[in-house]
Structure formats: structure tokens, C-alpha cells
Amino acid sequence: MGSTAISTQQAFCSLQKFTPLSYASSCRSLRSRRKWAVPARCCSPATDVATAAKENRRELLKNGDDKLEICRVLNGMWQTSGGWGRIDRNDAVEAMLNYADDGLSTFDMADHYGPAEDLYGIFINRVRRERPPELLETVRGLTKWVPPPVKMTRSFVSESIDVSRRRMDVAALDMLQFHWWDYSNPGYLDALKHLTDLKGEGKIKTIALTNFDTERLRIILENGIPVVSNQVQHSIVDMRPQQKMAELCQLTGVKLITYGTVMGGLLSEKFLDTNLTIPFAGPALNTPSLQKYKRMVDAWGGWSLFQELLRTLKTVANKHGVSIPTVAVRFILDQPAVAGSMIGVRLGLSQHIKDANAVFSLVLDVEDISNILQVTNKGRDLQKVIGDCGDEYRRA
């Protein structure tokens, strides 16, 4: 392992007072996560950055014989569900092709994200017809199933999954991420057992979760459900997954896929040096994601502390010649158990391909990590304020 990787490992181990994991657990994790070693091959800088970026681009999720390789920066398609601007179907599919052509070939969606699954079906057919087989082999479509609290019969689960398969025009879903609203209803175990059977029939390649807490993840694994990942909210502001959840994931091999990593765009230059207390003085919080994550900022420490964080991130970004969102994503990708982080895409309206691809070659050093953690340590512990992962969706 080269000097950069060693210094980064030492930084995280020496800064444990800023992180929830124990010294031993965190250091074990860093030793086991080979990606730390990738950027340290410094004998030929230009070649090395390209090699590091290529090797750091994809991650294998697995549980037993179930495997799925994804791009570590995922294209989140919540923004197709309304509230972010009108989506033109043709423009959206062209944008998806652009992302895939530039190596950003994993798309995350849900059954309730408006036309997201339908757009993926059109997109994947374009890939089949117009792109080489090598690109098709790297494209991944991850969807979610968020059922109502009804009895989870085999026929109901199977019919629901068939809807997504038809919309996405695939014989087997690459990944089905399951969400459940009410833990007092144990039907989630029935649903997951039926999903496991459907996986055995070849209708699903991998089973995963979204917004499950640590206790329920443990129960699910104890029931023999082959979960490969749990999708949770995780950002520099919201470090809850690095408490109980990451420790269980490290023990079991389950990975984390994170969303809210750039906080709907709040973690960007656009909101640097702005004062939202003055009406119309700053950028409008005019999307569901901006409004959601502004509430998270308020719970964490308020706008003044958030501005201090943005200024610190801007200093780090300038040092490396990247943007604030790139730093924000890289920081979370380097956390234990994190396999991939999501950036929401406004297909056909704006794009972030350059910033997203810059994540793969960015290496945060000891000084960067220390400066960021000195600010975040001033914020409230959101585990105490909100609860464990996903608890924000289950409180009255």
C-alpha cells in the first residue's frame, strides 16, 4: 500500500473521536476495503489517476451465490416523479444514453417514481439496438417495490413484480429493493420470502432493502433472506448509517447504497454564501428534495453551521480542482460499508456527468478529512434527533 493510502487510513483511525465507529472496527474496515489502496500508486501520476478511476468505478454486491456489479455513482430517478420540472420522454432517454455512454450506467428507480420504470424500458431497448454488447453488460436497473400494508400473498407479490418487469422490459430485475412502512406488521417477512422464491424462479437477480433500520435488517438476515444491500439516507450532514447500521453490514457483508448524498443540491456552490432567512435573497427551495434536505439541515445544526460546512468543502474542492458535490460524494463513498452513492438526475433538464466522473479519481487526504470532520462534529447527532436509518419515514 502506497503512502497516500496509508496516510488516509491513519487519518481515519486517528480521528475516531469524530466518528461513531470504534477504533478497532473502523481500522479493520479500512484494511479490508481495497479501494483505499488504489489511488496510492503514484509512480506515474497521469496513468495512475486514470487507472485508479477505472478500478474505483464499480463495486460487487453479493450474498452467497447472488452477485451484482454496479457503478459506484448511481443515477437516481426520483426526479422523474414530478416536482422538478416537466420531463420530456425523448430527451430523458437521450440523457440516460449519455450517462451510460460516459460510464455512469447504473440507474435507480421505483415503482412509484412516475414514469421512471417506463423510461428505463425504452432506454434499455435503445441500448440493445444501438450500442455494443459490452455496454449492455454494464447497464444496471435497480428498482424498488413499496407495497401497501395488505396481506403479502404469493400471488400479490408476484403480480406486483411482474408489473415492474413489464415496464422495464426485462426478464429479470437486476435488483428489487423492498420498502415496508410499518414494522408492527410482520408481513414484511412474508413479502421477502416470496421475493426470494421469485429470485429462485429467475424473475429477480438480487434482493435488497431500502430504508430499513438495523434491528429489522438483523431479523431479515436471521430469517435467511439473501439481502445484498440496504439503501439509506447518508451524507456529510447525516452520518447515522455509520453508527449501528455500518457495523452490522461489516459483519454480514451487506452493503449500503446511499441517497441524499448531495442533499438535493444543497451541498453545492449554488447555496454557498446565501442567506435563506431573507425572502427572495437566495436560491429558491423549489423542489421536493431541496425542501426535504433543508429540514435535515435545520435538525442537524442550522443554516449558519451549514454555511461553515460549505465553505470548508469549497476549500477542499478548490484544492483538488473539483466541485463541492464531488467532494461530498467522495467523502461518503469512503465510509465503511458504502458500495455506492446516488446523485439525482433531472433527465433532459440538466446533467452532472463531469462532476460525477470526477468522483472516481478524487482522493481526500488527511488534511481534507480533518477539516471536514471538525465542522461536522459541531452538528447534532441525528441518531438521537431522528433515530436509526429510515426512522424518519415511520414517525407520526
Give the location of each predicted region:
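Active-site mouth loops of central-metabolism enzymes
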Residues: W78-N90, W145-F156, W180-P186
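N-terminal binding-site loop/beta-alpha segment at the start of enzyme catalytic domains
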Residues: G2-V139
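Active-site groove signature of glycoside hydrolases
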Residues: R165-G187
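A short, structured active-site edge motif that brings together acidic residues
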Residues: L135-P149, L176-F178
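Short beta-strand segments at enzyme active-site cores
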Residues: T106-D111, L173-Q177, A208-L209, T326-A328
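Short, acidic/polar
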Residues: R86-A100, M152-D169, D190, D213-I219
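Beta/alpha (TIM)-barrel catalytic core signal, keyed to glycine-rich beta->alpha loops juxtaposed to Asp/Glu
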Residues: R57-L60, W181-Q383, D391-A396
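A structural motif
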Residues: D101-L104, V170-L173, I204, V227, ...
